[in-house]
Amino acid sequence: METLSRSLSKSLGELLASNSNNHFSRRSGSTIDDHDEEALKWAALEKLPTFARLRTTIIHPHEDLVDVTKLGVDDRQKFIDSIFKVTEEDNEKFLKKFRNRIDRVRIKLPTVEVRFEKVTIEANCHIGKRALPTLPNAALNIAERGLRLLGFNFTKTTKVTILRDVSGIIKPSRMTLLLGPPSSGKTTLLLALAGKLDQSLKVTGRVTYNGHGLEEFVPQKTSAYISQNDVHVGVMTVQETLDFSARCQGVGTRYDLLSELVRREKDAGILPEPEVDLFMKSIAAGNVKSSLITDYTLRILGLDICKDTVVGDEMIRGISGGQKKRVTTGEMIVGPTKTLFMDEISTGLDSSTTYQIVKCLQEIVRFTDATVLMSLLQPAPETFELFDDIILLSEGQIVYQGPRDHVLTFFETCGFKCPDRKGTADFLQEVTSRKDQEQYWADSKKPYSYISVSEFSKRFRTFHVGANLEKDLSVPYDRFKSHPASLVFKKHSVPKSQLFKVCWDRELLLMKRNAFFYITKTVQIIIMALIASTVYLRTEMGTKNESDGAVYIGALMFSMIVNMFNGFAELALMIQRLPVFYKQRDLLFHPPWTFSLPTFLLGIPISIFESVVWVTITYYMIGFAPELSRFLKHLLVIFLTQQMAGGIFRFIAATCRSMILANTGGALVILLLFLLGGFIVPRGEIPKWWKWAYWVSPMAYTYDALTVNEMLAPRWINQPSSDNSTSLGLAVLEIFDIFTDPNWYWIGVGGILGFTVLFNILVTLALTFLNPLEKQQAVVSKENTEENRAENGSKSKSIDVKRGMVLPFTPLTMSFDNVNYYVDMPKEMKEQGVSKDKLQLLKEVTGVFRPGVLTALMGVSGAGKTTLMDVLAGRKTGGYIEGDIRISGFPKRQETFARISGYCEQNDIHSPQVTVKESLIYSAFLRLPKEVTKYEKMRFVDEVMELVELESLKDAVVGLPGITGLSTEQRKRLTIAVELVANPSIIFMDEPTSGLDARAAAIVMRTVRNTVDTGRTVVCTIHQPSIDIFEAFDELLLLKRGGQVIYAGPLGQNSHKIIEYFQAIHGVPKIKEKYNPATWMLEVSSMAAEAKLEIDFAEHYKTSSLYQQNKNLVKELSTPPQGASDLYFSTRFSQSLLGQFKSCLWKQWITYWRTPDYNLARFFFTLAAAVMLGSIFWKVGTKRENANDLTKVIGAMYAAVLFVGVNNSSSVQPLIAVERSVFYRERAAEMYSALPYALAQVVCEIPYVLIQTTYYTLIIYAMMCFEWTLAKFFWFYFVSFMSFLYFTYYGMMTVALTPNQQVAAVFAGAFYGLFNLFSGFVIPRPRIPKWWIWYYWICPVAWTVYGLIVSQYGDVEDTIKVPGMANDPTIKWYIENHYGYDADFMIPIATVLVGFTLFFAFMFAFGIRTLNFQQR
């Protein structure tokens, strides 16, 4: 930077010398002094050419001249630090300077006014049982879609109105807040305004920007929708993510604005402030890797502390959820777009962080004339005050839209008043709800009667704000007043070549970050190369006859298969990246080809390296043709095969778009290419209806090129064949029906190269035209509609429900004294010089939880709230616990305690395919004592559903969080209900209101309160609650960072006791009127406050009378009451092993029945594979003339079992992975033993595999025309069934033995190659070297192929022709001598197959029982 400054100073010095008599006058009283160095430099700056002038500025404190495009990281950071010392205050000051500069020369900034008029959005969906994701329903859906394509429509769907006749105006320079309960249509409205609605929705009405319809410009570049889903590349850092976004979005009109600004300033003789000039020139300079706008955005969003941390995902630990949410916001505001639709951007953030971000956004809106519509979940009062306008949406209708100042007045005219200790936002979200409305009725002259949303909407139109809105809408926007730069008319504002460079840089970065993946792939290649080389070792290989040639062909085939399937990893890699790609494609960040081309080009060096590694190890160890030219030609084919394989797997991923479909569809495509590549079925014997597939199979060209290159080498050509009629090489090629012309090597190379190019073009086309399979769309759920209908009474009956419960329980007290908790010192801290071996997370925590008392467990992030709860509940899987924990005076024993306690986890983990009621029945039947009758259990389930207000949702499928099924708030209530049906005495709840809007949080807290009122002991961790949620608690246990107690005791009316306690401490500021006591309490007890007051709140608490009272209470409750006995259960679990198995089987059966994407996919794959195999090997069972016929049959059996089996194994892994996380929760609650659970999962697979095997066997057996004898058919069926079953259990086992699904897939895949090599087809058993023969006997596929062949041909005495043999042997003799198959071995084969099946099932159960990958 110093060199740059010197060179600029030199050039500007020359300009100064020639223009020393120029004078500029500063406005606002600033005058240029001829002797002022800074003024001279500004004067010289004005003489630079326009392009250079717009990139050069003066930087303080040394008045250096710099090119803004060459500012270093440190320079940018210093600038940001100097300008933004206190973010909120300094951001406002800086933006004010920015706006003053523009206003001084009277430049009008472009603005956008968004109008929506009479917008109605409807969706068609299935309802009732037809909507459940069962196998028949899924099959019907597929059939209906097919018929619709043919022009027939028999689909019976129900129309759901999401938005009903909504109109409004989003004005520039004003912050608009969008409020509404769940399923009110907020997301749909935001998507509609951003022009991003799903095409399947029916939309009427009109959305305009400055009077222009969405079709007249490019809305994706004019506005930005900021999703509530955080979709990012996990291995990129926060700064890299924002820099990529900034480079893709470009600078928009910033450069034009700056150019005009500088021109006018020059004409007017105005000098800008250096800081503002530097900032504006930096953010207007395009094509820089990292810009000042990124640093600015990081600072205002509070992300600068984690800018160099990777974002993270399920596999990689990264930033927190709240920080990830801010990255999603930053990714869009870093661009030039000033019209923003922001969807729930504060989820996971505490109220102070939310306030800071919204405040900064408010300043941007005010000073840059931006247009912002933002939806928030639980805006605190101080955040709510930052907005200018409010839109209140409920049941798809607008209840209010207009200035914030008038919203309470409107509801007061309707008879409702917001209480003093209630946030306005919370009030607005509850006042339209039937359950909550009555409490706000304030008109004492009239009796309360429910006012519906439609009635509110009607009244708003007559209210003066509504009338003014209608008046404004009636006057069309004058299109001619629209600033030329307001709307964007080009799809990409950055040159395509520049976008390619941006994507290239990102791809290179991702390859570096994924180095472990590529290293693992290379290691896998090396291991497979060494295994192949030692199996086909040259000392064991001959070149004397056709049989030797066949072994070499087998080695070439295996080499081709390994390198072809080396590209399989591209499948998961591509699908993993698709969500981010689709998001960025739809936002018009870059065209699809800039994504696919760098992936292809940067894969070339990796393929070269892997190919060289493979060929270097295998070529001479196996003993292929020794000429260097043939080595290089072999290497070229292997390299091109790897490139082609990468292309084909990326194409499959881009087309299928999900792992299940890609595994199924991709495996079918590969099976077809594999079968018709010319090596399993010789070219001449492929049925005429499949001939076309041979010519379009890339593997055929690879196979031809490799075999022609090898077999036309001198050592094969100069050796005569066994009948001396031709050369041995040509004879081998003729036996396998391979082309004998040497030109076929180059034809093969050309074919592979052509397919490589073709597949990469197809990848780009698929990325361009296909959309995500499950595009997120906000739809009012049927459950919500039912809930509304069910509430037609004037009052919710659940409010007045009798709190008695059907089943009795024993109220219990939990006391704990001096609890300490330690973990091993993290490695990172030891590296920083920490000498201790243990890190203390809880320190001398003492307290009591009592029946009928609702206790809040609070503290700042890192205080140890969840840690304390996990320690007390016995959920910790590691660490060291000290202290005395007692239940009603008796020492706590975990196995007993688990039976009488419930734990509601924050993550709401449930089986996704069962309904709400089924979830509760399952929990009740496993956790209630076996003495309770079935009738009582069912009655108790109904009682609990009523208590937690889930009656109207009882038939709703739970679904996956954030994707399908229940909303977040409904899942919270289900989590509570699942624990309640166990009839516990003590319930722990971890963050029951996190991620909920105010109304949903109120519903959950009402559920919690109802639970406490039954006499149970309830403890909740809570984070930044609103006033009314905080004051719903009876007692508080407050922790400071370090796990120390600073308050334990009652809250009191209006929190007066906690307020009095802290205000009594000298120096603690008094609470402001109407301020949230929870927020105040955390602020005054923070570490910063401790440092300021020079006090340790934990020590102060220990010297207080409150502490002594608590110690006395703990001492009193630590002694059992006279005559009391400790809890005792005769068995560990409530149910017997048989009872546990029956309940687990019941739930697993439902899960399988409602998982059509798993079962239909494997059924379809098996059906398609069977029909494909049958038609390719049509009547092959009747052909017994030569050895090739037998090879074809063995090849068919081997390919079918391997592909169908691998598909079974891959497909089951995601299902088991999802259910395992549920298993961890249920096992911790002592619901069942691991054995019955594992056995139920194993048993559930049997009927599905039976069905799969039945139609597979019937199709294959009939089409291939095997002998229809009972014994042969039975053995074929049995071997196929056991094979498919052991493959399925193998997939289940890999999940149970590994920490996650991705590792399971890698672990399983590592053995598929070995199964392939040692199956007995690629190299017959007699040819396997003695040092590898042991693996043949433990390879399950080898036993399968053995059984299938022996069952069909073990007793056949027909003779066949074998090349190189003078006498024709019998088939029985040939399979025994060539393949090593003993005809009398069927019983041992059957026994071994059953053994493999049981072994894999046992290992699955063993893994589930003994391995726990959940870290707590």
From Swiss-Prot:
Induction: Repressed by cold/dark treatment. The keyword Secreted does not apply. Keywords: ATP-binding, Membrane, Nucleotide-binding, Repeat, Transmembrane, Transmembrane helix, Transport. It is a multi-pass membrane protein. Expressed in roots and stems, and, to a lower extent, in seedling and inflorescence. Its main location: membrane. InterPro entries: AAA+_ATPase (IPR003593), ABC2_TM (IPR013525), ABC_trans_N (IPR029481), ABC_transporter-like_ATP-bd (IPR003439), ABCG_dom (IPR043926), ABCG_PDR_1 (IPR034001), ABCG_PDR_2 (IPR034003), P-loop_NTPase (IPR027417). Belongs to the ABC transporter superfamily. ABCG family. PDR (TC 3.A.1.205) subfamily. PANTHER family: ATP-BINDING CASSETTE TRANSPORTER. This is ABC transporter G family member 29. It comes from Arabidopsis thaliana (Mouse-ear cress).
